[in-house]
A protein has these predicted regions:
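Short hydrophobic beta-strand element within catalytic cores of glycosyltransferases
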Residues: 276-278, 297-307, 317
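Nucleotide-sugar donor phosphate/pyrophosphate-binding loop at the beta->alpha transition
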Residues: 75-83, 111-143, 148, 156
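Acidic donor-binding loop of glycosyltransferase active sites
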Residues: 254, 270-289, 303-304
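Carbohydrate-associated surface elements
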Residues: 153, 174
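Conserved acidic donor-binding segment of nucleotide-sugar-dependent glycosyltransferases
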Residues: 295, 319-320, 324-331, 340-346
Length: 380
């Protein structure tokens, strides 16, 4: 059976979403064929091999190889790693690869290795000098088996920027449904986490970077005096900044900062909530073409979702059907959406149930299987 070599573009392990997504995809691919994840070598990372499955709640095991690479200064470090990763994959005699890194994808395709490239953010990808050749050079076919974009908006952006349309495939992100089974009762989750039993709890999971709408959500608390906001994730610097913002608004006693928690523990926090908030703003750099991991986790948790309304969000969430979508960039719409689901149990239950049904189409295994079919993995 063919082995798939997955070339990550980020450090493994890391709490960043691109690390989580790479690990989950490798576990998804591993449902069908053997997988080896290739990542940049840093001594402190390679010593944490046993930490990966426990921290990230991976459904299946796969091999991991941290590849040493020449550090040619910050400007060329990425290219140095990409060359080292591609060389390693070639030395291993690979016939099938998947890459988040444009240079590696290009070099492997030039060498005749069947490879898929995963695209997440056009503006970042096209900064690589090789990007234009990767997406536009017809001589790379058939080795370059496809460019897999996480949203329809990104497919259109790539096509408009010159990518060959026949290479572009839609591949939204996914979720491990097994992590949400069996479901945990709200009261039990709150008891485990030490949360108040009788207070309305709204939860946000994920990073707390500026522009992610957390400031607007804190402002919304001033309009929701009975609500406790549970923030799961975030760096120490972001938490400090947002603590100050909460104090300035007088809501600091109704915000609980959990910081980074193991990925496998995230469902417990979602189950503890009465509502889940996804408050992206127009300042979010990736807002046009994103496919947020939290969106699928929220859907799987069976709690009502209040999300800001952007085209990429509407590819999965539908206002009044499986979520409430509200105008971005302000506290009042977020507060109004949360008020609706908190005050209307029938609405909250209906959109939650629909989201739980819809998310079954978005598992990592299904995503991996669709990609492998495009790549013709049986024939690589």
């Amino acid at each position: 059976m063919n082995k798939l070599f997955y070339i990550a573009r980020s450090r493994i392990p890391s709490p960043r979403a691109n690390c989580v997504q790479a690990l989950k995809m490798c576990a998804g691919f591993a449902a069908t064929l053997p997988v080896e994840l290739v990542a940049p070598y840093y001594p402190e990372d390679a010593r944490r091999r046993d930490f990966l499955r426990e921290q990230f709640a991976l459904a299946r095991a796969f091999d991991v190889r941290w590849v040493p690479f020449p550090h040619w200064g910050d400007r060329f470090a990425v290219r140095g790693y990409a060359l080292a990763a591609a060389a390693y994959v070639r030395i291993r005699g690979a016939r099938l690869a998947y890459s988040r890194e444009p240079w590696s994808a290009y070099w492997l395709a030039r060498a005749g290795v069947r490879v898929g490239f995963e695209a997440h953010f056009l503006e970042e990808d096209r900064r690589h000098p090789v990007w234009g050749r990767l997406v536009g050079d017809s001589s790379l076919s058939p080795a370059l088996g496809g460019i897999f974009c996480i949203s329809r908006s990104l497919v259109e952006d790539y096509a408009a920027a010159g990518a060959r349309r026949e290479l572009l495939h839609l591949a939204p992100d996914g979720v491990d449904l097994q992590r949400f089974e069996p479901a945990v009762e709200r009261a039990d989750a709150r008891k485990t986490l030490g949360l108040p039993a009788g207070q309305a709890v709204v939860c946000h999971s994920g990073h707390l970077y500026p522009g992610r709408g957390i400031e607007e959500t804190l402002d919304a608390l001033t309009l929701l005096p009975e609500v406790l906001l549970l923030l799961v994730g975030g760096t120490a610097d972001d938490i400090e900044r947002l603590r100050a913002h909460a104090a300035a608004r007088g809501v600091q006693d109704r915000v609980r900062f959990e910081g980074t928690v193991p990925n496998g523990k995230v469902p417990l926090y979602l189950y503890a909530a009465d509502a889940l908030v996804m408050p992206y703003t127009s300042r979010t750099p990736t807002v046009r073409a994103m496919s947020p991991l939290k969106m699928f986790e929220y859907m799987a948790a069976g709690r009502p979702i209040v999300a800001t309304d952007f085209p990429a969000v509407r590819e999965v969430l539908r206002d009044g059907e499986n979520a409430l979508l509200v105008a971005p960039d302000g506290a009042e719409p977020i507060a109004a959406g949360l008020r609706r689901v908190l005050d209307d149990p029938e609405l909250a239950g209906r959109i939650s149930r629909r989201a739980g049904l819809d998310v079954r189409e978005f598992t990592w295994e299904r995503r991996a299987d669709n990609i492998l079919k495009v790549l013709g993995a049986d024939h690589a």
